[in-house]
Amino acid sequence: MPPKGKRGICSEEKGRMSIMNKKVLGIAAAAAAAGGAVYAASKVKKQAQAQGMRREKESLQPRNYGDKQVYLVGGGLASMAAAAYLVRDANFDGHNIHILESMDVLGGSNDGAGSVQQGFVCRGGRMLNEETYENFWELFRSIPSLEQPQRSVTEEILNFDHAHPTCAHARLIDKDAKILDVRSMGFDNADRLAMTKLLLTPEERLDNMTIEDWFGPHFFETNFWYMWQTTFAFQKWSSLFEFRRYMNRMIFEFPRIETLEGVTRTPYNQYESVILPLKAYLETNGVRFETGRTVTDIDFAPGEALTATALHFADGSAVDLREGDVCIMTNACMTDSATLGNLHAPAPAPERKPVSAELWAKVAAKRPGLGNPEPFFGNVNESNWESFTVTCKGNRLLKMIENYSGNIPGSGALMTFKDSSWRMSIVVAAQPHFKAQDPDTTIFWGYGLYTDHVGDYVKKPMRDCTGAEILKELLHQLHWEEHQEEIMADVVNVIPCMMPYVDAQFQPRAMADRPPVVPQGSTNFAMVSQFVEIPEDMVFTEEYSVRAARIAVYTLFDIPKKICPVTPYNKAPKVLLNAARTMYR
């Protein structure tokens, strides 16, 4: 049964659709022709789902791995997913799988922590998508829910999401705190032409180009740009290559970008809803977690073949890889070097270098074909933004936001203050968002894209502001100055988080700067992260991490199963027609 609010447009929007100019059909036809063979997206999706149902019947012939070991460098979702595929699909002994994490907690960028006394914090929030997370949903159908062990994590998330549909009523807000009508994308003919031309241009021609290299000034003043930018954290200087990937991959969501109906939410933060169940599954199967273990270098055997032979650690120790051992490395992490502030202190300027990117640089310098981290991690002024998590006693502030926006907590997704100098947005999740929240504690999350800009009301750059100052800037954007004192009295904490490399994966680059998951000539080495190259897929997603993990394991272990393909919505005539109509709204 289709979830309420997850298909089509919001109920109050029905009936507004009108017959579009014949140009719409021309654009849709051109795009469909350029795509080559036309696929039925629904058919492909059904095939992927059927594959998931068959996987239990496709068990491998027993294999004798002996005492072979697998070392997974990095403890984020990609490494954990790789471990799950090793256990589930390669029948590999979990006791011989080692996840090596430099921090004292697993999950990588999927974090969530705190208490009712000290406040809660998430560095970021991951918006899942039912239509495009093919391998994510397939994997987590195998992972039992912690709260409902008879159900899978996939069932748990989708059931929750269908019961809490998203339909934003306050997507963009102007400097007068007026909620804007964003039904129209705001494109002019030059914008439409540029967008169509981009979608028809092979990505091989887009090396090192930025979004502002392609589009004119008007494009960056459209409703579409404000919404697309803040939904996915793009900047004008972001990679045109990645923008094009997003337009193709998320074209199904383009017609409903103003309501964010395609957003799929987890019951709690992703650490508790995704990472902890996966960790429990791996623990049950004997996987070894080694936290506080920083890999600083990897040795390779001489010769044309790429064979990892040793791992070196920050404490001076080393592990030799024997014949048959495997190393799968997280070659970079977007939340490396993140720092936290509090209500009375700004997040400190990051001093720690990105550990995972430093390791990647050492590895890449040893031979060609292993990528280049410099374009991603070489310009911190362009790759940073700052988030903040607000914890309050009682629900006074959340009720005010609900009454203002018309969205109950969990139903509205992003609210963006488009004229704010920080390009500030907030999200109010369904409560509780943390299992440790009590009924009298509420939280919400927000972020600003332009951390070097002086605030409109707090006359300091966002990066220099305390949590209290960031919240005061937000209250002024809403013109709630007269309520500031009573609101601040309810605040437990506002925790700013500066992430210097959180947009690194969107930095302009050449095609060769991201290495393949399994480099050419590899016998036992692979890389998984948001910084590997997976044709057709888009970075900055949970799906990218899981897909990379699946490619790595299936390739290195010769798994005779299919990986769920990227669903080609950009080749489905109906989807293209809806997208073309949206361009003329």
Identify the residue ranges that each predicted region occupies.
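Conserved FAD-binding subdomain of flavin-dependent enzymes
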Residues: Q118-L158
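Glycine-rich Rossmann-fold phosphate-binding loop(s) that bind the pyrophosphate
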Residues: G74-G76
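Rossmann-like flavin
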Residues: L146-F252
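Active-site-proximal substrate-binding core of FAD-dependent oxidoreductases
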Residues: T555-R585
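Helical element adjacent to the flavin cofactor pocket in flavoenzyme catalytic cores
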Residues: R249-V326, N331
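Glycine-rich FAD pyrophosphate-binding loop
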Residues: V87-G114
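C-terminal segments that line or cap access tunnels to active or ligand-binding sites in enzymes
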Residues: I251-T264, G324-V326, M334-R547, Y554-L556, ...
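Extreme N-terminal leader/targeting segments of oxidoreductases
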Residues: N21-V70, R88-G94, N578-R585
